[in-house]
Amino acid sequence: YEISACLVGSEMCIRDSCEAGYRVKFYTAVNLAAELAEAVQMNRLSKLEKSLSKIDLLIIDELSYLTFNRYQSEMLFQIISERSERASVIISTNLEFSQWTQLFENEMLLAALIDSVTFRSFVLNMNCSSSYRIDSTLNHD
């Protein structure tokens, strides 16, 4: 699907999902990778994974600003692939799938990750020339 106007933001999606009674968790990709790494260090990864498995919608935002080492990539893959047939995941990024090689070191893992992300999914191309935030700010006056 392609959406020509950028009217939908993460905040709106979270609000609407919560109002509909869904359990939602929002992370930036970097924060999720950091929380997973911290959970491993604190010996509480299984607790975090169990917590994430109980939510209806996991939103991972900004998957394009920093690269992930092999370990971080593996942990992100584990979380995303575990949810692939069981619960919803929204990933926002300004990169096409072909550009994800810039983010992840392991190309085989990346291929499996993209396969998990795209299986039975809707891919929305929301790249547009205008910005909802900028338009909203300019029209606020």
Residue ranges and their predicted role:
Residues R15-Y27:
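Post-Walker A helix-loop "phosphate-sensing" segment adjacent to the P-loop in P-loop NTPases
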Residues R23, D56-L57:
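The start of beta-strands in P-loop NTPase/AAA+ ATPase cores
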Residues E11, R15-C18, S84:
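Residues within alpha-helical segments
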Residues Y1-G9, C13-I14:
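Single conserved hydrophobic/aromatic residue that forms the stacking wall/gate
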Residues L7, L52-S53:
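A short, aliphatic-rich alpha-helical micro-motif
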